[in-house]
């Protein structure tokens, strides 16, 4: 016993710090990824709150027409947002010390870059921390794999898309109405609704919601009663109990008769893998779709694809969507372009003397 105490006392300060960082006995696990996650997420959160409340208007389009996004400059919770970094900055790394003054940094939307880059680093470290804690506890790594879907989606809209478009001003604003504006403009410029990867993402999100509701309702409906009629059924469960809390055979039989036999899982493990994999794979595809459309590999174009025997166009829903896209596009950055992009691309005729 004496030898053990002596060994503990002789342990270096660094060794004790390492043991504390990697200890699974802490109320909240820190881990080596947490050492980077905590300061980056605290920085992103702090700057977001301050900027959402008090940041001055930002010249997002680089045309000396600042756009207001903070509460103190006339917005509310719905309309407020962190305005993306100015198109005048493009993809340049724009920390505070690169600007001539803090006022210039704020005018050019410096807080957006600061928040986004710290946030992406923080959520990536959160994913690594999930893997690290799973490793320490001897668990399989699939929690971190599942979390990679929202990390990929955030990286796509905040980093990959601006890189593909050439400016952080094309990134998604950090606010409710700003998010909707980003979605509308994205549809106008890339026809995302006609992209198969977005369709897979919709199937993943809505399908995941459906399967989650089906699973939860089936389990809740087939609980093994351990309580009286006057008690909540939830009181019949104790954390860590060895007995099954619901009858999977009854749930399997019910669903097999409701749809057909092979629509129901008879293996709880494969069922829960399916519940996790379906939305994750769907969101992976959506993130991949955003990343490809960032470089203008856009959704399908079926405009004027149906004509009659005389060559006259018979409009389809694709043409209706195209007309909506044109309307949304001409309303976007309406003061930044003197001509629609289709006309601006045509060479002007040369004139002599």
Swiss-Prot record:
Residues where Phosphothreonine is found: 2
Biological processes annotated in GO: photosynthetic electron transport in photosystem II; response to herbicide
SUPFAM superfamilies: Bacterial photosystem II reaction centre, L and M subunits
Annotated a quinone binding sites: 215, 264-265
Cofactor: binding comment: The D1/D2 heterodimer binds P680, chlorophylls that are the primary electron donor of PSII, and subsequent electron acceptors. It shares a non-heme iron and each subunit binds pheophytin, quinone, additional chlorophylls, carotenoids and lipids. D1 provides most of the ligands for the Mn4-Ca-O5 cluster of the oxygen-evolving complex (OEC). There is also a Cl(-1) ion associated with D1 and D2, which is required for oxygen evolution. The PSII complex binds additional chlorophylls, carotenoids and specific lipids.
Positions of the record's site feature: Stabilizes free radical intermediate: 190
PROSITE patterns found in the cross-reference section: REACTION_CENTER
Highest taxon above the source species: Eukaryota
Catalytic activity, reaction form: 2 a plastoquinone + 4 hnu + 2 H2O = 2 a plastoquinol + O2
Coiled-coil intervals, chain numbering: none
Annotated binding of [CaMn4O5] cluster, by residue: 170, 189, 332-333, 342, 344
Main EC class the enzyme belongs to: oxidoreductase
A molecular function GO annotation: iron ion binding
UniProt-listed CDD domains: Photosystem-II_D1
Gene Ontology, cellular component aspect: chloroplast thylakoid membrane; photosystem II
UniProt xrefs under InterPro entries: D1/D2 (IPR055266), Photo_II_D1/D2_sf (IPR036854), Photo_RC_L/M (IPR000484), Photo_RC_L/M_CS (IPR055265), PSII_D1 (IPR005867)
Site feature: Cleavage: 344-345
N-acetylthreonine sites (modified residues): 2
UniProt topology in membrane: Multi-pass membrane protein
Complex and partners: PSII is composed of 1 copy each of membrane proteins PsbA, PsbB, PsbC, PsbD, PsbE, PsbF, PsbH, PsbI, PsbJ, PsbK, PsbL, PsbM, PsbT, PsbX, PsbY, PsbZ, Psb30/Ycf12, at least 3 peripheral proteins of the oxygen-evolving complex and a large number of cofactors. It forms dimeric complexes.
Function: Photosystem II (PSII) is a light-driven water:plastoquinone oxidoreductase that uses light energy to abstract electrons from H(2)O, generating O(2) and a proton gradient subsequently used for ATP formation. It consists of a core antenna complex that captures photons, and an electron transfer chain that converts photonic excitation into a charge separation. The D1/D2 (PsbA/PsbD) reaction center heterodimer binds P680, the primary electron donor of PSII as well as several subsequent electron acceptors.
PANTHER family per UniProt: PHOTOSYSTEM II D2 PROTEIN (PTHR33149:SF12), PHOTOSYSTEM II PROTEIN D1 (PTHR33149)
Family under the similarity heading: Belongs to the reaction center PufL/M/PsbA/D family.
Protein name: Photosystem II protein D1
Gene source species: Gossypium barbadense
Gene (UniProt): psbA
């Amino acid at each position: 016993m004496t030898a053990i105490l002596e060994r503990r006392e002789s342990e270096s300060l660094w060794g004790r710090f390492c043991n504390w960082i990697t200890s699974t006995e802490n109320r909240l696990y820190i881990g080596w990824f947490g050492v980077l996650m905590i300061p980056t997420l605290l920085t992103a959160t702090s700057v977001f709150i301050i900027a959402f409340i008090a940041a001055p208007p930002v010249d997002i389009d680089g045309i000396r027409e600042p756009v207001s996004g903070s509460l103190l400059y006339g917005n509310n919770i719905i309309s407020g947002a962190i305005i993306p970094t100015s198109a005048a900055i493009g993809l340049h790394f724009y920390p505070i010390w690169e600007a001539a003054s803090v006022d210039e940094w704020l005018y050019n939307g410096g807080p957006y870059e600061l928040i986004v880059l710290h946030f992406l680093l923080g959520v990536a470290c959160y994913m690594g921390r999930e893997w690290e804690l799973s490793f320490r506890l001897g668990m399989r790594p699939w929690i971190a794999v599942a979390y990679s879907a929202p990390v990929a989606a955030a990286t796509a809209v905040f980093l990959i898309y601006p890189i593909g478009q050439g400016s952080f001003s094309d990134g998604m604003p950090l606010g409710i109405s700003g998010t909707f504006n980003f979605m509308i403009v994205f549809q106008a410029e890339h026809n995302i609704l006609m992209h198969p990867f977005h369709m897979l993402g919709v199937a993943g999100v809505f399908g995941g919601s459906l399967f989650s509701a089906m699973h939860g309702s089936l389990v809740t409906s087939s609980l093994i009663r351990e309580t009286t009629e006057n008690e909540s059924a939830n009181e019949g469960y104790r954390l860590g109990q060895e007995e099954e809390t619901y009858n999977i055979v009854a749930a399997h039989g019910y669903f097999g008769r409701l749809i057909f036999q092979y629509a129901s899982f008879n293996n709880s493990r494969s069922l829960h893998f399916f519940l996790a994999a379906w939305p994750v794979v769907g969101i992976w595809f959506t993130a991949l779709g955003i990343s490809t459309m960032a470089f203008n590999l856009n959704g399908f174009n079926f405009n004027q694809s149906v004509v009659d025997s005389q060559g006259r166009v018979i409009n389809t829903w694709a043409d209706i969507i195209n007309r909506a896209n044109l309307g949304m596009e001409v309303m976007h950055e309406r003061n930044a372009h003197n001509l629609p992009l289709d006309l601006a691309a045509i060479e002007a005729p040369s004139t002599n003397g």
